[in-house]
Amino acid sequence: MCFWYYFFGILGIIIVLLIIFGYPRKKNVRTSNFEGIDDPAVAKAFERMTNFLPFKLLRRKIISQLKKITPQGTLVDLGCGSGNLIVEIAEKIPTLNLIGLDISSEILEFAKKRAVDKKMEQKMEFKVGNAEEMPFEDNSIDILISSLSLHHWINPVNVFKEIYKVLKPDGTFLIFDFRRDSRKFFYGFITFVTKIIVPKALKKVKEPLGSLLSSYTPEEVLQFCSQASLQDIKITPFLAWMFISGKKR
């Protein structure tokens, strides 16, 4: 009897994997997304969504990637949103000097409150700023990270140039985002989440489907980095997302 439990269990897993990976990748034309969050209701809804399990797992993955580079010095979280990631970094890597940067003052209020609630407000600061004109001196940042922000960048080449400018020599950047050429199965799942699961305020702005549709492909990102004169870029693609990392040489 145990044999058949294992057999059908393994068979079920194989069928699910075939369904997921058997679907071809989508070839959508990119649609632009909003650059920042000005609506308090949308900001609050985004804050709630970041507490869902997939986002918690994502933050763990980013921090594990971050630990691989022996992080030290000043770290900027570009597009820090409501501060979940930067606060967790403060808890896991307390030696870093942390700065959260976001274009939306509305969402930063949630980040500041989270830092206070976690008693981490002394370990970080938050700034309102544009990714294309960051409020930092040239060659002043050791590490720059960004999670689910790339697809909001209107001029990604200019942002990558700015990243290169503010990083110190041998400074590192690590960027995580969706990839628009995700498999059709994932598009179906995100469409379901957008229409059924998320708070009403996010349904109105068609999120998170809008973020997926406005994301870039790995090939496009490589082209942006090349136009920004960035070298030694590594893109690690996954089912529906990608990690982009590099150093300033």
Predicted segments with their positions:
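Class I SAM-dependent methyltransferase SAM/SAH-binding core
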Residues: V76, S82-E133
